[in-house]
Regions:
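N-terminal glycine-rich phosphate-binding loop and ensuing alpha1 helix
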Residues: 1-67, 99
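Conserved beta-loop-beta/alpha segment of the NTase-like Rossmann-fold superfamily
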Residues: 59-157
Length: 157
């Protein structure tokens, strides 16, 4: 199962935090809230993520493009192409992250529609990229499959 994470909104209610970065990149414990959501989903076996970006998309792209260098020791031979070697492994090494710019003003349904081309016909879940909730994804998936429905919506208080 893949996860589409909606990470393109303006975050107007958190203006002091989101004036300079998108809301999913606001840090909690030294990591972006988006990372915490992905980490939580990975505990349920979800390791393929499509991050549907918009507002300040470049910051999310830069975060994942530079993820290995930020989280590992490495050796680089300057002046040689393809000479970068990372020395440490981390729990996220098996994650696959697709960052898809889905438009600056695109609404939720439009973001899902634009990200759908990366799903390859697989079942998927959609989650907001700026809020972490205590949801038992295994139980949710089981309930969804048992009901044989097209869509299951989960809300939390």
């Amino acid at each position: 199962m893949k996860a589409i994470l909606l990470a393109g909104g303006l975050g107007t209610r958190m203006r002091e935090e989101t004036e300079f970065r998108p809301k999913p990149m606001v840090e909690v414990g030294g990591r972006p809230v988006l990372w915490h959501i992905m980490k939580n989903l990975s505990h349920f076996g979800i390791s393929e993520f499509i991050v549907a970006t918009g507002y300040k998309s470049d910051m999310i792209k830069d975060y994942f493009l530079n993820y290995e260098a930020r989280n590992n020791d490495f050796t680089i031979e300057l002046g040689r192409q393809e000479s970068l070697v990372f020395h440490d492994a981390h729990d996220e090494a098996h994650w696959s992250v697709t960052v898809a710019h889905t438009g600056e003003a695109t609404m939720t349904g439009g973001r899902v529609h634009r990200a759908a081309r990366y799903l390859d016909g697989q079942p998927f879940l959609v989650a907001y990229g700026d809020g972490l909730a205590d949801v038992d994804i295994d139980a949710l998936r089981e309930s969804h499959e048992r009901a044989q429905t097209l869509v299951t919506v989960t809300t939390v208080q």
